[in-house]
Amino acid sequence: MIATSDLRKALGCFATGVTVITTRIAERQVGFTANSFTSVSLSPPTILFCIGTARASYVAFRSATSFTVNVLSSSQRTLSDRFATSGDDKWQGIEFVEDALGNAVLAGAAAAFTCHKRNTIEEADHAIVLGEIMEFRQCPERVPLVYCQSRYCLPKEVSGDAFMALT
């Protein structure tokens, strides 16, 4: 049997970006922090994210027809922490604009992808949500926030010589 805590540590060796995924349901914004975001295809442009089915926000995302993935910048660690918690008060004082589909695009994000939801696949205690990108925004000058080994990090370029020394 696999020990959950050991598996979590091993999976934590994979560095990821940090996102806040948003949707709008019945005139209210819903959002949560996720690092389980990845591209699926460029044609058609498709992405996916995973969400725990026990999360309070899962019901909203299950019924939503669209969502936006906000890729957080390195200055948005507190935003990541805030959206990792439950409760409606997490939107208090948050600066955002609504995209063409009504979802929140967070001010200061490194990138944002507005998607029509294509499919939701429930697996174990999570759901995989696939979306087709309808529009995107990016600010290349913003450094993305990274999460690895249970810590926030900044990406750092590795020179060819340094990389060779590690292999």
Put a short name on every predicted segment.
Residues 1-167:
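Basic, polyanion-binding surface patches
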